[in-house]
């Protein structure tokens, strides 16, 4: 009798489809991206307030994202065997510690490494949040709700960031991040301890061979490297074209606000349009949006480009993660997909930094566009194999 009671309690604790778990994941996931979601403004803040070069500023955010990527690799390999509550609590404390240390040593040589440490904590939080949101029965809806919250924060964060930095400087911003991460420990109580295979059943799942799963992961990696490159340099692209900082911030605010509409559109259209159509439109449209920024765009063209990029990014991401989840019956694929996502977002700035030559961003933008196209082609390969298996069932 006691064993049955314990089993019932265990099942309640790992119900990833329950609203307490979903809401906690959405809130904690937003805490995990406090820095990343306003990264273009952070880059400009480093240039203006730490007096570093454009390339060094991009490199600094790249180090933070490298920490995120390392954490998600760790999580993909061993993290799912550890109590999720312990992981999230540790991630919050590491992120808070890294942010606080960064605030106290913003001009020190070790600043970049402190950002990497903060990024490692952020990556632990992000990995768990994305993993159990992504494996829920209504993955597209839940990922989209996640995006709505973090984009709402990002929109206002980018809009007000120049003013905030003028008042409290970079160090003050990191103190705020540390405080929010500490407060978020309250939400750990609502995080499930793990997940069970029973919660992973989805009618569209077909198990693909390992080689095709690897191709799918390479597609996710290429797509997110492109996103990481673009997101790191957007502010610099605008200012290098002669647009003032506040006008660039306004354009990015508008793009974040409209990206909320993109995420909501994925909720409303998830069951109304073919997933493959949504993915094609999102990825190829993202490439076209970056193409609008080639050369020296004016305010209108810059605004159109960044808005298109951000809307489509947040529209297509739930569809991509939903598609990836359909390739693997065990549900473990989602952990690796999140790792590839974070490696790409972290590697993007590191790839972009040496391509910035002080003369413009054309090379960076062309590499970004090429990676979008490569990701689309790669994702089609396992998608077609999945379609054949689904038709034969």
Task: Cite the ranges covered by each PLM segment.
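Extracytoplasmic gate region of multi-pass secondary transporters
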Residues: 40, 212-253, 257
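Structural signature of the two symmetry-related core transmembrane helices
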Residues: 86-100, 277-292, 366-369
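Helix-loop-helix hairpin linking two adjacent transmembrane segments in secondary transporters
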Residues: 136-139, 144-193
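Helix-to-loop junctions at the C-terminal end of transmembrane segments
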Residues: 71-84, 262-275, 356-357
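A late C-terminal transmembrane helix in Major Facilitator Superfamily
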Residues: 327-361, 368
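Conserved MFS/SLC helix-loop-helix module at the cytosolic interface between two early adjacent transmembrane helices
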Residues: 70-107
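Cytoplasmic helix-loop-helix junction between adjacent transmembrane helices
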Residues: 114-149
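C-terminal transmembrane helical hairpin of 12-TM major facilitator-type secondary transporters
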Residues: 273-320
